């Protein structure tokens, strides 16, 4: 696959993730958009690692590290969303003012 095609795909994923993160009012949707952004970054890491040096796997290893961090972030984020939903009965971002009881 050509480098330009993969970079365009990654740019589309990143743009969709940023747009969803900006316009999202639901916490779960915002977390999903954040994961989409991280996956676009992973695609770039693997693509540039393969394009510049096939013998070294630095981009692939760093991508696996980012996936592990993203999994931990998703687990913690969903736990926080679950806790907020139990207390506030809503997952909307604008209704979850934690400073006001």
Curated annotation (Swiss-Prot):
Enzyme class: translocase
Keyword Membrane included in the entry's annotation: yes
InterPro entries with a match to the protein in the record: NADH_UbQ_OxRdtase_chain4L/K, NUOK/Mnh_C1-like
Molecular-function annotations in GO: oxidoreductase activity, acting on NAD(P)H, quinone or similar compound as acceptor; quinone binding
EC number: 7.1.1.-
Compartment annotation: Plastid, Chloroplast thylakoid membrane
Catalytic reaction(s) noted: a plastoquinone + NADH + (n+1) H(+)(in) = a plastoquinol + NAD(+) + n H(+)(out); a plastoquinone + NADPH + (n+1) H(+)(in) = a plastoquinol + NADP(+) + n H(+)(out)
Keywords in alphabetical order: Chloroplast, Membrane, NAD, NADP, Plastid, Plastoquinone, Quinone, Thylakoid, Translocase, Transmembrane, Transmembrane helix, Transport
Pfam families associated with the record: Oxidored_q2 (PF00420)
Transmembrane segments: 2-22, 32-52, 61-81
One example of a Gene Ontology biological process annotation: photosynthesis, light reaction
A Gene Ontology cellular-component term: NADH dehydrogenase complex
Its membrane topology: Multi-pass membrane protein
Role summary: NDH shuttles electrons from NAD(P)H:plastoquinone, via FMN and iron-sulfur (Fe-S) centers, to quinones in the photosynthetic chain and possibly in a chloroplast respiratory chain. The immediate electron acceptor for the enzyme in this species is believed to be plastoquinone. Couples the redox reaction to proton translocation, and thus conserves the redox energy in a proton gradient.
Family as reported in the entry's similarity comment: Belongs to the complex I subunit 4L family.
Subunit structure, as described in the record: NDH is composed of at least 16 different subunits, 5 of which are encoded in the nucleus.
The name this protein goes by in its record: NAD(P)H-quinone oxidoreductase subunit 4L, chloroplastic
Gene source species: Cicer arietinum (Chickpea)
